[in-house]
Amino acid sequence: MPVKPSAQNNSPSKPTSKSVPVDSDSLVIGDAIYHLADHTPMMVQYLNMKVNYPQALLLYRMGDFYELFFEDAKRAAQILDITLTRRGTDKAGNTIAMAGVPFHAADSYMARLIAAGQTVVVCEQIDESATGTDNANNPSNAPTMGDKQKKDKSKSTAGTIMRREVVKTLTAGTITDDALIAPNHTPTVVAIDIETPKSNSKQPVQAAVSQMDLAAGTLTTQTISANQDDIESLQTQMLTVLARFAPSECIISEALSDSNGDISEEWLLWLRQHLNCPIIEVAANDFHREHASATLCQQFEVQRLDGLGISGAPLAQSSCAALIHYARQTQQRHVPQLNQLIVEYNDDYLIIDANSQQNLELFTPVSSNGTSLISVLNHCQTPMGRRLLVQQMKRPLRQHSRINLRLDAITSLLDTDKQSEQCSGNISLVTSLRETLNAIGDIERISSRIGLMSAKPRDLRKLADGIASSAQLTTLLTNAGISHEQAGLLPMLMQQLPAQLPAVQSVAELIERAIIVEPPAHIRDGGMLAAGYDAEFDRLTHLHDNIQVTLDEMVERARQESQLPSLKVGFNKVSGFYFELPKMQAKNAPAHFIRRQTLKSSERFITNELKTVETEYLSAQSLALTREKQLYNELLIRLGSHLAELQQLSAAIAQIDVLNNWAQLAITYNWQRPVMSNESKKSSILDNSLENSHSENGLNNNSQTSINIKEGRHVVVEAVLNPIHTHQNNPAKHSSHFVANDCVLGSYENPERLLMITGPNMGGKSTYMRQTALIVLLAHCGSFVPAARAHIGDIDRIFTRIGSADDLAGGKSTFMVEMIETANILNQATNKSLVLMDEVGRGTATTDGLAIAHACVNRLVEIGCLTLFATHYFELTKLAQNPKESSGSNDKFIRNVHVAASEIDGQLLLLHQIKDGAASSSFGLHVAKMAGIPIQVLNDAKRYLVDNLSIDNLKPDNESIDDDKNELAKSVKDKRQQTYDSNIEKSNIRNLDKKQKNIDIPQQNQLFSLQDELQAIDPDSLTPKQAHDLLYHLKEIISY
């Protein structure tokens, strides 16, 4: 089936440029027209290749360089900061721009181009003499990229253009070579297929998002849907899936951009606004839904799709099929390692959207010098383990049975570890596993490269060494009393280790027999096969390396057979190898000796055998290299037949590594096992109480959830306060200086579902909120948690509204961004969600902000979600103190807590303790002083504060409103807009006149001035006269 090469559309407002022939003598590539008659045969060859990849950068091999021409050269020169030169002009006088990179350093340049969002197409020279044998045995019929080839002068022989072929296409999501992949990065591609029914139809809008991890050999897909009038819901779901997939690039059908429909245009625009990766438009035929089933059946070698779980999901089929086509196109071959299909559903995982991931700093810190959660947690010893840990953190489990399976495995490791410590001189199991895992290479990516026929000799040696080390894992676990015949996660993983997989053992044995211990980095110069692997290769190598021995053996055999004791062998550039006999013995030469040269005292002969040895010697090196490459390709094919077993081994090692990493963190930081259960003490009484209470408000609160954390700690803050080298094999335990706090929501003892958190800035409100979310996240990942005890119920999502940032490019202010995030929470949260909201409403006028925050609290209580709500609006604390302050009996579901702080000698002491009740002050001026605000500014702030407090104190008692139920709403109105009846207003004015005699604003300014003067006086340095004058001066100020 013909396919269209992928093309990156870099201009959102402009359709992808098509490359088509204008006529038989011209080509259109992008916006340029090339007349073939104006170019040399080599440039015609280049243009005929380039026309298939109009948006990609074509690296065209010429001898020891990869060259780029025309617009490609200009773009690459700008990105790589290399010299832009020219390759003369065409016949029409147009300059041919050119830039190049050396082939031996091409990997680094390719990596930079890919990182810049470019697609790189590699075109290699095909040396017929060196690769003719290879091509017969190479399924891809493609040469190995990077092989050393002869200097290219555009022609391999007189009048003949050297043959070249595109061997692979490198894109951000399909690269598998470690030299091209950034550290701790997993290249993936997503395909999105959308089906929008007709406007008069009642069918829902559906979409499928599928992900391909070529290195891991997995396809993952999820189908989402929404009503036609609720497209925002579908987009929100899609963003959630994309946050979990974290794609390096995205492919869509060109039909989506070519469509004239408004819906398609809106979707395309929305994707470009929200996807932070290249969007590639591929042929609509790749997404063809009628052909998708056949493509998938062929790839997975099945007759029907029923066993794959997507038989009734046409969009999932088409998007997965498009990814398979894309992989085949970019790799220029079939991709047998792509052999696992995973179907995901939202209910499978605890959902954390992209904003919440960033607010919690899970993978990237907010500030450049910050610390992310993953950097503290990820001390896995293998590359596969490090990648798997990231995947598990992006996919926290919902099912408690699966979570407990992981927790049981960690418990087993820790229990065995404690037993080992009790035996003097024994290294703990966790430490031993770390040391063994550290010796295992990246089996996952090596296996993928074997499937793509691109694995290097050193890859194979690493694979063999890794298999040998993984066999030791079985020994360690067995010696610890864990058997593969037992139940549980660890025994199940042991069944996938070499001891239980004979095919994996045969792979290691084959590599040990075939590859030398220290092979070269590349196959281009040979020297990687071990002696004894192939008789013909050994003969050619022996012939070249031991020619003198071969000749000596031949001479000795001829002397014995022909009785010619004076027979000698020699060599010169004219005659080549020859036998030489003295004149007296020449007449006794055997009949098969052919006279070649007569000298004064001797004669020289050749034989067919000697001529054969000469020919083989002169070509032995070339023949040996050709044979070695052929054998190496055959070896990769043999190893490729065991890809499934190698992927099983890689997955098992990665899971053991992650479990052992969790165990090590539990030891190092004294983490405890959480209890994952929906049931708590006296749960039936609690459920009945909540049901009755919420039924009064008309709320549905079935299947409520709860959390109960005792002495919880923040993972990252604790690690920063107590730095430990957890990457070492024997990390030390630490004593924490972190102040631990409890967090209880929805339990029997504390049925409240919203904590109203007040207290000073810098007191630890945000830290307390984040630590609660991180503890819940770790528990759902199947890890022990930083707490003395933790009971976690069924949590479906974690939402956060923390921090502030604007979106200038999107035209959104800080407050607008805050409101968008708040709206998302209020629309998406359920009674099983954990919500963190920090200072909602602070980005606008105080009155508006307070009103919004008040309404948000009411809405969150109605939803019934577990909420941590931090605020500096102290008016909100009344919601928990008096049920009349809100629209319903919210006092049963809101509890005030505050961050403790003390003021000692004018200095603020932050205690970082969470205590019941509302805070008395935010201590804003104290924090400003700690930040270094100038003293003059602080004094001015104090005056302004006293002035406003004085005015507030002058109001009469009868200003209050009788209706307590509306008091909070009235208090948030601007004082300038309050109206009173005439009698109250007159009373206010009279009372104000009376009190202003005692409290005058100018007088208070003088008091501040007096305070400053007194602080500047040094009593010990004053003379009696100066002290006397000063007393009069102070009295004048007081009497003012």
UniProtKB/Swiss-Prot annotation:
- Keywords of this protein's UniProt record, alphabetized? ATP-binding, DNA damage, DNA repair, DNA-binding, Nucleotide-binding
Quote the Pfam families the UniProt record gives.
MutS_I, MutS_II, MutS_III, MutS_IV, MutS_V
Q: Which SMART domains match?
A: MUTSac, MUTSd
Q: What Gene Ontology terms describe where this protein resides (cellular component)?
A: cytosol
Polar residues composition-biased segments: 1-10, 130-143
> Which pairs of Cys residues are joined through disulfide bonds in the record?
none
- Residues that span the membrane, as ranges: none
- What residue spans carry the Low complexity bias annotation? 11-22
Instruction: Tell me which Gene Ontology terms the entry assigns under biological process.
Output: mismatch repair
GO molecular function terms listed in the Swiss-Prot or TrEMBL record: ATP binding; ATP-dependent DNA damage sensor activity; damaged DNA binding; mismatched DNA binding
The similarity annotation says:
Belongs to the DNA mismatch repair MutS family.
Annotated NCBIfam families: PRK05399.1
Role = This protein is involved in the repair of mismatches in DNA. It is possible that it carries out the mismatch recognition step. This protein has a weak ATPase activity.
Can you name this protein?
Answer: DNA mismatch repair protein MutS
